[in-house]
From Swiss-Prot:
PANTHER family: CYCLIC NUCLEOTIDE-BINDING DOMAIN CONTAINING PROTEIN, CYCLIC NUCLEOTIDE-BINDING DOMAIN-CONTAINING PROTEIN 2. Coiled coil: none annotated. Its main location: cytoplasm. A nucleoside 3',5'-cyclic phosphate binds at residues 116-239. Keywords: cAMP, cAMP-binding, Cytoplasm, Nucleotide-binding. This is Cyclic nucleotide-binding domain-containing protein 2. The lineage of its organism: Eukaryota, Metazoa, Chordata, Craniata, Vertebrata. GO terms for cellular component: cytosol. The gene is CNBD2. One of its GO terms (biological process) is spermatogenesis. One of its GO terms (molecular function) is cAMP binding. Essential for male fertility. Plays an important role in spermatogenesis and regulates sperm motility by controlling the development of the flagellar bending of sperm. It is found in: Cytoplasm, Cytosol.
Length: 576
């Protein structure tokens, strides 16, 4: 009987405990659901996924905490990459007189991504933002037809258009290399200003978005006065140049009508190869640099410099490199250091190593650096340091063999173009055999330039012998790649020496620097600092995986470096 009562009590307790655990689980789930509801309260009735609800994109809900109604517009969060923003479209649907100053400024800020719009002066930018309207056209739509009078001019916000000489624009889809205008370009401005007839046809190659300025709005808001001010500025700039001193005002105005002002910020790329550019550029303000992407591996000077410095990778003292003992001195030193044990086999070892190093070439080559000057001993007291063996992959180039890791490139400054100088005419009248065909990059240092197409300029100077004589004097002889490579190596040696000297003279920071948990692995090429460290050429490290790596089509053909850390003597030995 007693056993039965104990068993019944245990079953009852077990049942009650199970009910208690179930109740606790339900309470925890309720609390978790409540937390989720509070966290996602702002996303209730979120209608952004289904396109059917885009007809009513604005919804609202009552916020108990704030005691107010919160309104949410889903159209503000729709991502349409590259398209003109819906808010700006709504502003441009208004008449110019109905647009507020804040709306005009908002449109002006959005249009700063367009290069052609940004080149206008700030007052003219605001006037254009006030009168613009938005248009979107599909593929094969003819925007401007040849022979018609110009009533509008256009800014391309998205898409591509082609320029053709036929009336319907069909040749653009048959030509393998049509003349194209992309986002940021504009066309039709001068035709609107002078009410001239269109000389070409513009057709859409894909769905394209335009910002259009009509002729009526153009003159009603006095945009012609601002455009005339820019034209007067270009005229005065050309008139001050000695090159156009013999031209009449009428002929100079023809040049002004075909020229355009463009502004570039510091470090902005102007042209990847201005020698192949179809434009002539007059620097009206600021300055720019001519750069050359130099393939260092193709230079004999760079190859000799690499091999000279790789011989120092063993880290021997300075005296052992500067002085080489004569055979008699080496024999006397051997007798002193090797007494009573003598091993004559090591006397010719350094010379044999030099001879072995010159025999044969292969893709993978071992660079044997010189060991210590002490001979190889049979006894345990005096031991010579073994020669260090460096194994690296080799490539065969025109000057000779070069370690694969050392085949890099560098951007070298060739020339600085100042205000008043001209680019694009330095080889205009040279024979084809004497022209410099190397690609030269033009980078802005914060400048303003005036562009004009070469064919238009050549038409204006046709049969003008005096002008041609002046242009022949503008020829610029840029240095050869070999000279630029030698200058780069000299500058690099000085920069590395200066850094070594600063590290020696400047006291290190007393406070302990923060060290990350994951130790940084030394690599021969550091893409962040753009430095090639040849001292680590023989050290094997595991490859590091960066968070982001640009596609190869966006990268230059060579690994770009700004400095090369080569094996070198210690700075203390040089100053001793």
């Amino acid at each position: 009987m007693r056993r039965h009562m104990v068993t019944y009590a245990w079953q009852l307790l077990k049942k009650e405990l199970g009910l208690y655990q179930l109740a606790m689980d339900i309470i925890i789930m309720i609390r978790v659901c409540k937390m989720f509801r509070q966290g996602l309260r702002g996303f209730r009735e979120y209608q952004i996924i289904e396109t059917a609800h885009w007809k009513h994109p604005i919804f609202s809900f009552w916020d108990k905490k704030m005691q107010s109604r919160v309104t949410f517009d889903t159209m503000d969060f729709i991502a349409e990459e590259g398209h003109f923003p819906p808010k700006a479209i709504q502003i441009m649907q208004k008449k110019p007189s109905w647009r507020t100053e804040d709306e005009i400024q908002a449109v002006c800020n959005i249009l700063q991504v367009l290069d052609s719009y940004r080149n206008y002066a700030e007052p003219l930018q605001l006037l254009l933002a006030k009168v613009m309207r938005f248009e979107r056209f599909g593929r094969r739509r003819v925007i401007i037809k040849k022979g018609q009078k110009g009533n509008s001019f256009y800014f391309i916000y998205l898409g591509t258009v082609a320029i053709t000489k036929d009336e319907d624009g069909s040749s653009a889809f048959l030509d393998p290399h049509p003349k194209l205008l992309h986002k940021g370009s504009c066309f039709g401005e001068m035709d609107v200003l002078h009410a001239s007839v269109r000389r070409s046809t513009i057709v859409c190659m894909e769905e394209t978005e335009f910002l259009v300025v009509d002729r009526e709005d153009f003159f009603a808001n006095k945009l012609d006065q601002e455009v005339q001010k820019d034209a007067q500025y270009r005229f005065e700039f050309f008139r001050k140049m000695e090159l156009f001193a013999s031209w009449s005002d009428e002929k100079l105005w023809q040049l002004v009508a075909m020229a355009k002002i463009e502004r570039f910020s510091y470090g902005q790329l102007i042209s990847k190869d201005f020698g192949e550019s179809p434009f002539i550029m007059f620097i009206s303000k600021g300055s720019c640099e001519v750069l050359r992407l130099l393939d260092l591996g193709a230079s004999p000077s760079y190859r000799r410099w690499i091999w000279q410095h790789l011989e120092l990778i063993d880290g021997r003292p300075l005296k052992t490199h500067l002085s080489e003992y004569s055979p008699m001195e080496r024999f006397k030193e051997f007798q002193i250091k090797s007494y009573p044990l003598q091993d004559f086999s090591s006397l010719k070892l350094p010379h044999l190593k030099k001879a072995w190093g010159l025999q044969g070439t292969s893709f993978s080559r071992k660079i044997r650096t010189s060991g210590d000057t002490l001979p190889k001993m049979l006894g345990p007291k005096i031991q010579s340091r073994p020669a260090q063996s460096i194994k690296c992959a080799m490539i065969n180039i025109k000057p000779g063999e070069l370690p694969k890791e050392a085949a890099v490139g560098a951007y070298v400054k060739v020339h600085t173009v100042e205000q008043g100088e001209i680019l694009g005419l330095h080889q205009a009248f040279l024979p084809e055999g004497e022209c410099d065909t190397r690609p030269l990059i033009l980078m802005s240092l914060g400048n303003e330039l005036i562009r004009i197409r070469k064919e238009i300029f050549y038409e204006l100077i046709d049969n003008d012998d005096e002008m041609i004589k002046k242009l022949l004097k503008l020829n610029i002889a840029f240095p050869s790649d070999e000279d630029m490579c030698q200058k780069f190596l000299q500058q690099n040696s000085w920069n590395i020496f200066r850094k070594d000297l600063l590290q020696l003279l400047v006291e290190p920071c007393q406070s302990q620097l923060f060290t990350p948990n994951r130790p940084k692995k030394r690599e021969i090429y550091n893409p962040k600092s753009v430095v090639l460290d040849l001292c680590s050429i023989n050290k094997t490290t595991k490859p590091r995986y960066p968070i982001f790596m640009a596609p190869q089509k966006y990268l230059p053909p060579l690994r770009i470096v700004q400095a090369i850390k080569a094996p070198r003597y210690k700075i203390r030995e040089l100053l001793a």
